[in-house]
């Protein structure tokens, strides 16, 4: 990790995606080495919090987040990546019911293709992000 950090500009932050390996011992170890943890479920969120990761440095992404998962993430102060209009509505309701601050980022799928990358991220409804 030290070599990777040395090769990157200081403003670049390194996050561990728990979907790579959510084993608590691995997350405990990685939490000490990275700037944040990315989770995709309530169980991953629990493991990340139990590892001692700062809630401010945890992000929650993925389609189909359940109301209970959103409530738990908001209560903990996690950054939530909004991926649908339904999530916006749910988060607004949580905010109105609790008064809790809601930290969000919006995943947007632009309607263009990156030339020569082989990747097309938008151009129609997808389960990941808002077009």
What are these regions (language model features)?
Residues 9-131:
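Active-site-proximal beta-alpha core segment in soluble small-molecule metabolic enzymes
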Residues 1-8:
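A short, N-terminal amphipathic alpha-helix
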